[in-house]
Amino acid sequence: LAGLLGRLVEANLATPESPGKWCLRIARKYDPGVEAPVMELLDQYLSDLSAYRDDAHLASWRHHGVSGQVWETLTMVWRHEVKTLDELCARLQRRGFAREDYALALQELVERGWLAQDGENYSVTARGDALRLEAEEATNRYFYAAWDCLTEAEIADLRDLLTRFGAALKNTNE
C-alpha cells in the first residue's frame, strides 16, 4: 500500500497537468522519510494526496476570479448544505469570517448570475451549476492525470488495500 501511494505522490509531483502544487509541496515538507514506520508513511502519503487534490481543485476554479470564501459559499449552496445566510454562517463559523463577509459573498454570487435569491433563500442557477460541475470535472482531470503511473491491476490492488485498511482502522475504533 505504501509503495503504491508513494508512486502516486511522486507522479503527482512530476506531472505538468495541474497548474500549481503549492499544497502538495507544503505537505511534502513533513515527509518522515522512507525508513519511517509504515503507518507514518501511509499517513504522509494520504495527506500528500489530499493536498494534491486541494491543488487540483484550486486550479479548477481560480480562473473565475473569485476568492476562496466566495467559491466555498457557492459550493455550500450547490451541495444543498445551506440555503440561507444564517445557515451559511452557522455551518462555516469555524472559518472566522463575519456575517457581513458571507452576505457579500452571496451578493457577489447573485450578481455573477451563479446564485438566485428568493427572499432569504439562495439556490444555484443553471449557470452556477454548470460552472461548479465544470470545476469538479477539471479537478478530477488534474488529480487523476498522474494515475497512469499505475497499471489497471495496481489501481485495483490499491482500491482493495485502501478498503481493507479503512475497515481495519474502523474496527480498531469500535
Where are these regions (language model features)?
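Alpha-helix capping/termination and helix-coil
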Residues: E81, L109-G113, F143
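Residue-level detection of the helix-turn-helix DNA-binding "recognition helix"
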Residues: Q107, L133
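A short, conserved structural fragment
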Residues: A14, V110-E120
